[in-house]
């Protein structure tokens, strides 16, 4: 059977990035747990060996259980009866296997029953699972909601809830409502304090809630009477054991069928406040969403890998005009671009996760002791990098997943339109990635300030100073010219001082920045491991050079007066 980790050597390459030594040092507090837990690592090499073993176990379960179950789960899906969700039979098997392997609460401290893993190896597990079944990946990876509870909950909540997630219970984040999708400040689910019971009560409806019948819910609700904006919202913990929430229905979706997307009715449900009042949206949900967006980036890379695998296998097997179709330039052109997008997107994903790891670890240390001036500077640096890279990783990888799924079907020709082939499920599952946890348009909104304040350009210029192999130098020279075009476009838009114009071309600027950053990352990877990445570096540079030229031409020639022609 396939192993979804060992079969993809690029994963081990990214795991062994030099930044991991600093990440492990921070996460393990210089390996202090070894005195208390026999499974805690003794040193850096031991920690890396542990990550490798867990990833191999995840890859094995994915290949032997999750992947074979995927088609049946897609067809059966979950069911709703008496206000509760019943998972598909294959989903139950998948969950049981992951729980038995101890793959829950992976990033949580060992004192709560977790593995104390950094986010990077956990994100790799999420990618691996999504490559086999993106719908199940949603259910399993929602365990990372516990990061938000760990970060903002109190000690009592830590001791009561975190061990349950580490033992295999499930989570959901209940944010959106019928009239509050992207505009979360419009959330109206009502939270009132019950003086008699000394608890909060939740009343209202939530919609489009992934894994909505989970054991523990993080809920965004309006706690401040008379408010209508984000400052009236707080975050609450709802425990399914308390009762008071029913599943009204499971949505009938295009894809990710195994993942129950629910409409929930809160009827005087007992809940407790997480953190401080009024910070639910402006602080806690923002942290929750950043984690979720990294998760969708991982899911997208997994789907891109699955699409490439299916397309490559079919192109090698299918013969037309006396030879395998992979020998035709039209086909190997598609496959090479799919692989290049996959490699570039994965490079961006794990660069982002490493940034997140360092700033999160330093945040956690700051709750134990005062950071040194050097640590505060490091924390500030990586918090900014994580915040700027996350919308790029989510937006670009979700778009690439959709493009690769489209091309996978195209390679299959008429057969790709038939339900017998996995590519149609990959195509349907991929479609949601550029929509949920913030559409690509919202990722652009999150990223555009890093365009206009010069942060992305500064990162690109810093990457230009990193040495590369002689073989990569010509590509790097062309990449400098791409950055110059990006800078010219950025300056034109800033100098215009026209907000509507900036909003109109923001997506193009966002993609130009991402293209330059990913091309640099791929050149760095090709320098270190040419046997894995040299071809993709060439293909990707050719691809994004044309993309940057296209966007540059549009922006530099565009006149703001022409906006009137675009308004519908």
PLM region spans:
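C-terminal amphipathic alpha-helical interaction region
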Residues: 454, 466-568
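C-terminal helix-coil-helix/basic helical segment that borders enzyme active sites and/or dimer interfaces
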Residues: 343-394, 490-504, 523, 527, ...
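A glycine-rich, basic-preceded beta-loop-alpha segment at the flavin cofactor/substrate interface
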Residues: 39, 241-244, 248, 260-292, ...
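Extended, charge-enriched "interface" segments that sit outside catalytic cores
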Residues: 1-81, 85
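A short core secondary-structure module
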Residues: 199, 203-245
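Alpha-helix capping/hinge segments and adjacent helical runs
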Residues: 2-5, 9-10, 17-19, 256, ...
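A structural-propensity feature for long, helix-poor, extended segments
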Residues: 154-160, 439, 445-487
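Internal helix-loop-helix
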Residues: 59-60, 90-163, 167, 210-212, ...
């Amino acid at each position: 059977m396939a192993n979804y980790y060992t079969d993809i050597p690029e994963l081990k390459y990214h795991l062994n990035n030099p930044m991991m030594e600093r990440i492990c040092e921070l996460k393990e507090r210089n390996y202090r747990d070894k005195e208390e837990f026999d499974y805690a690592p003794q040193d850096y090499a031991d920690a890396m060996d542990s990550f490798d073993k867990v990833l191999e176990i995840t890859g094995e379960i994915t290949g032997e259980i999750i992947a074979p179950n995927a088609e049946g789960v897609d067809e059966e899906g979950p069911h709703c009866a008496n206000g509760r969700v019943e998972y598909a039979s294959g989903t139950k098997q998948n969950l049981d296997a992951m729980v038995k392997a101890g793959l829950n609460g992976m990033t949580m401290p060992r004192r709560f029953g977790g593995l104390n893993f950094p986010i990077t190896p956990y994100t790799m597990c999420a990618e691996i699972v999504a490559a086999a079944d993106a719908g199940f990946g949603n259910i399993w990876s929602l365990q990372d909601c516990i990061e938000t509870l760990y970060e903002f909950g109190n000690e009592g909540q830590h001791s009561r809830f975190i061990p349950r997630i580490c033992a295999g219970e499930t989570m959901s984040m209940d944010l959106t409502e019928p009239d509050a999708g992207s505009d979360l400040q419009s959330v109206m689910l009502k939270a009132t304090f019950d003086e008699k019971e000394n608890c909060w009560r939740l009343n209202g409806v939530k919609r489009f809630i992934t894994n909505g019948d989970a054991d523990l819910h993080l809920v965004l609700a309006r706690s401040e009477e008379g408010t209508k904006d984000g400052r009236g919202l707080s975050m609450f913990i709802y425990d399914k054991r308390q009762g008071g929430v029913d599943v009204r229905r499971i949505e009938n979706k295009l894809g990710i069928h195994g993942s129950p997307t629910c409409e929930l009715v809160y009827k005087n449900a007992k809940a407790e406040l997480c953190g401080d009042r009024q910070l639910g949206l402006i602080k806690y949900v923002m942290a929750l969403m950043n984690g979720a967006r990294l998760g969708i980036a991982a899911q997208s890379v997994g789907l891109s890998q699955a699409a490439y695998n299916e397309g490559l296998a079919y192109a090698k097997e299918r013969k037309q005009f006396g030879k395998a179709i992979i020998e035709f330039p039209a086909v190997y052109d598609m496959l090479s671009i799919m692989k290049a997008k996959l490699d570039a997107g994965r490079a961006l994903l794990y660069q982002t996760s490493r940034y997140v790891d360092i700033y999160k670890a330093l945040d956690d240390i700051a709750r134990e002791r005062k950071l040194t001036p050097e640590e505060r500077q490091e924390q500030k640096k990586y918090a900014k990098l994580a915040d700027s890279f996350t919308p790029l990783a989510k937006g670009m990888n979700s778009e690439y997943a959709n493009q690769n799924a489209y091309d996978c079907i195209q390679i299959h020709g008429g057969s790709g339109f038939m339900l017998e082939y996995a590519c149609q499920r990959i195509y349907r599952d991929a479609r949601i990635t550029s929509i949920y946890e913030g559409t690509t348009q919202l990722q652009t909104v999150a990223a555009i300030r890093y365009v206009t304040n010069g942060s992305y350009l500064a990162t690109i210029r810093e990457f230009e100073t990193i040495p590369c192999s002689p073989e990569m130098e010509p590509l790097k020279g062309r990449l400098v010219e791409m950055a110059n075009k990006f800078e010219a476009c950025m300056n034109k838009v800033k100098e215009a001082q026209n907000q509507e114009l900036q909003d109109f071309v923001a997506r193009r600027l966002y993609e130009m920045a991402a293209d330059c950053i990913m091309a640099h990352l791929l050149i760095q990877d090709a320098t270190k491991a040419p046997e894995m990445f040299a071809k993709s570096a060439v293909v990707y540079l050719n691809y994004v050079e044309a993309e940057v030229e296209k966007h540059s031409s549009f922006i530099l020639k565009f006149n703001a007066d022409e906006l009137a022609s675009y308004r519908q």
